[in-house]
Amino acid sequence: DAGNRIAAPACVHFTADWRYTFVTNDCSIDYSVTVAYGDGTDVPCRSANPGDILTFPGYGTRGNEVLGAVLCATDGSA
């Protein structure tokens, strides 16, 4: 699950609100990322090229929390 993955590097930023979580790749290389949620919600990994802004679900209205952006395996095992 996403909670056991490695945190994305500092150049990958996220902002979260109740509806959306935006993940921005300000790094110079591509990363495969997802978002970790406090309740363990699992969302698919997505590829982020340099400069990309990805949209993931927000924390909702039921007390969930976005813990951060995390890296995914690049070999398809994520």
Swiss-Prot record:
UniProt signal peptide: none
Alphabetized Pfam families for the sequence: A_amylase_inhib (PF01356)
Cysteines joined through disulfide linkages: 11-27, 45-72
Keywords carried by this UniProt record: Alpha-amylase inhibitor, Disulfide bond
SUPFAM superfamilies per the UniProt record, alphabetical: alpha-Amylase inhibitor tendamistat (SSF49498)
Molecular-function GO term, any one: alpha-amylase inhibitor activity
SMART domains named in the record: A_amylase_inhib (SM00783)
Keyword Transcription regulation: no
Gene3D superfamilies in UniProt: Alpha-amylase inhibitor
Statement: the UniProt record of this protein carries the keyword Disulfide bond: yes
InterPro entries: A-amylase_inhib, A-amylase_inhib_sf
Protein name: Alpha-amylase inhibitor Haim-1
Job of this protein: Inhibits mammalian alpha-amylases specifically but has no action on plant and microbial alpha-amylases.
